[in-house]
């Protein structure tokens, strides 16, 4: 989809996006298609409208609290959960004060006895923040920012999983 097409405001946009997402990706080794193309197309169409009203740059004011910004992103942006919002903030350099709690990090915390929850148990912002509090406390004990610690844990656990296979 071209930038011009992305900016257009007609109702056919959602259908066009769904068609693109439903097609198989020729560059993919598995030749797989996108999961839930209609839902993702609807979310992208809604997201487009939301971002046209208030661009991301204005949502990421430097003086804002990272957790508050993440909560606002989750609340306002369709299809964006706490992990995705945290990853976005990290990738644009907005904050290393939020944790990215993926399956590898959660598995590590389970192995060392800090958590008993599964990955699906942190899908809401409330449970994500509760689990993030555990990650933050562990990061403080280790003497590193949570944004660097979760990265190191992710790399270590990913390598360990490959060794176990």
Task: Give residue spans per PLM region.
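Alpha-helical ds-nucleic-acid-binding substructure associated with the helix-hairpin-helix region
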Residues: 2-78
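C-terminal accessory module of base-excision DNA glycosylases/AP lyases that mediates lesion recognition
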Residues: 40-48, 56-165
């Amino acid at each position: 989809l071209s930038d011009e097409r992305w900016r257009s405001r007609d109702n056919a946009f959602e259908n066009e996006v769904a068609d693109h997402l439903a097609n198989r990706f020729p560059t993919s080794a598995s030749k797989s298609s996108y999961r839930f193309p209609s839902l993702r197309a609807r979310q992208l169409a809604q997201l487009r409208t939301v971002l046209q009203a208030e661009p991301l740059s204005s949502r990421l004011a430097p003086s804002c609290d990272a957790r508050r910004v993440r909560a606002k992103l989750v609340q306002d942006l369709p299809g964006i959960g706490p992990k995705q919002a945290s990853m976005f903030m990290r990738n644009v350099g907005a904050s290393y004060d939020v944790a990215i709690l993926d399956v590898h990090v959660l598995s590590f915390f389970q192995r060392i006895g800090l958590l008993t929850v599964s990955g699906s148990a942190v899908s809401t912002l409330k449970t994500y923040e509760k689990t993030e509090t555990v990650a933050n406390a562990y990061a403080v004990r280790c003497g590193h920012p949570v944004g660097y610690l979760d990265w190191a844990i992710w790399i270590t656990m990913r390598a360990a999983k490959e060794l176990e296979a």
